[in-house]
A protein has these predicted regions:
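ABC transporter nucleotide-binding domains
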Residues: 1-163
Length: 163
């Protein structure tokens, strides 16, 4: 018998053809300024035309060399850094079309998880406790179901890495 967990939030049918996130031709360029008047003399193309999608229930890990734009991609998707061009559709909603109030309401549904193998995971805490902190913070699972939920998540992660 498979465990089913109902998170403490309303879930509707996918609005975007089964895609939780769709990023199309995303660009983030930062101006290079020089001189006393800080005139723009060029641009750093931190992200220059990336496209991908994530289906409901799936996970994406963005991996690359230091300085290649991974963090900028994440921050641009979340609107923490402004985009230069492209589209970001989360759960059927254009993130860049939202006003401040609606964006703030959407934020608890989106997050980046940074992974530095030398500092982000505490050797004093099991991974399940680290995940549990986020689940508890957002009130996604009732406390009485937390252990079963975390066991379920950890088993799913283990099985998905072995395939």
């Amino acid at each position: 018998m498979e465990n089913t967990f109902i998170l403490n939030r309303t879930r509707t049918e996918p609005k975007n053809g089964g895609k939780l996130l769709e990023v199309r031709n995303l660009k983030t360029h930062f101006p290079i300024k020089a001189g006393l008047m800080q005139k723009v003399v060029g641009y750093v193309r931190a992200v220059d035309g990336i496209s991908f999608s994530i289906d409901y229930g799936k996970t994406l890990g963005l991996v690359g060399e230091s300085g290649c734009g991974k963090t900028t991609v994440g921050k641009t998707i979340l609107r923490l850094t402004p985009k230069t061009d492209g589209d970001v559709i989360f759960d059927g909603v254009d993130i860049y079309a939202l006003d401040h109030k609606d964006l703030r309401a959407m934020r608890p549904k989106m997050q980046l998880i940074f992974q530095d193998p030398y500092s982000s995971l505490s050797p004093r805490l099991p991974v399940s406790e680290i995940i549990g902190e986020a689940v508890k913070e957002h009130g996604l699972v009732e406390n009485r179901h937390m252990d079963d939920y975390l066991d379920h998540v950890m088993k799913n992660c283990a099985s998905s890495t072995s395939t």
